[in-house]
Amino acid sequence: MREEHLSLLVCSRCRGALRVSAVQERHSDRLIAGELACIKCDATYPIVGGVPRFVPRENYASGFGLEWTRHARTQYDNNSGIPASEQRFFGQTQWPRDLRGQLVLEVGSGSGRFTEQAAKTGATIVSFDYSYAVEANAASNGHRDNVLVVQADVFAMPFPTRSFDRIFCFGMLQHTPSPARAFAVLPIFLRPGGHLCVDIYKFTLWRTILQTKYWVRPLTRHMNPERLYSWVRRWVDFMWPLAGCIRRLPKGYALNWRLLVADYSFLGLKGDVLKEWAYLDTFDMLAPRFDRPATLRTVQKWASKSGLEDVSAEYTPHGVVLRARAGRGALLAD
């Protein structure tokens, strides 16, 4: 982390300001290893690998840490050969491509493929994840002067309230213990009139019944992540020839998903890249401790309860996408 980014952080316990209390390794203006301390209470937070850590490295989201460190660059556009991350980021947020002078918060960064897209706007990006996937993000984006990567908990975010011009949260809400509560804390960190964009898996009773991942998740979500990942690779390898045949059928890729083989051929992926995405997202289907989708109406209710304005919500291939702006609710809540 850059020392000048210290002002973007606060103590996650008491909200006090932080100071650098120890430095073990520094590269120019970047702190690689050291410690932050609260000036109000006795809390201290290690800096490991250039990332301030406000939660233990290992936690209920460790499966995501394994996933995104093993596949650190798999879904980056320059690796996949398709602009999937760019299109999703700007398509869902509908934000301008020039955000210089603005402060943007990314909630749930994973490996950082959307961090990269956000950073290209010129805004200052504060990106955090609950898992140690932050290490993959830091390796890919931590060198950027306008990026701060943090490991933190959405329910105890170490940032000043009402400080961000924009917040986005992709692919994360459904994997928290309470998506409604996680959503509710986001507007508190927006400046008046600030922009919010989130997505969450779509819930329908029929869709849930048909999605075979929910049949096996009661077993797989309790497995050791390393063991599950090994099983997933063997399963995808075993099924790959059959999946290739099924893929030739009309919408055969959808049947492959039901057979627990993530198939992104509809995006135009091929060969080794397609198979790498299959390893990644098959594991992603089965590993999360929590998988709690929501309906469009439910997400709209969350927004209304939070006092958000200019609310727009829609179903997309990625689930429910909501865009909104902070109103009086963001000013009053704290």
What are these model-derived regions, one by one?
Residues 226-288:
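SAM-dependent methyltransferase
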Residues 195-237:
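Conserved class I S-adenosyl-L-methionine
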Residues 201-218, 271-289:
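Short, glycine-/aromatic-enriched active-site segment of Class I SAM-dependent methyltransferases
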Residues 180-192:
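A short glycine-rich, Lys/Arg-flanked "PGG" loop and its adjoining helix->strand segment in the class I
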Residues 171-172:
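Short catalytic micro-motifs in class I SAM-dependent methyltransferases
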Residues 1-158, 291-292, 298, 313-334:
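Conserved N-terminal segment of class I S-adenosyl-L-methionine
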Residues 167-168:
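Hydrophobic beta-strand segment of the Class I
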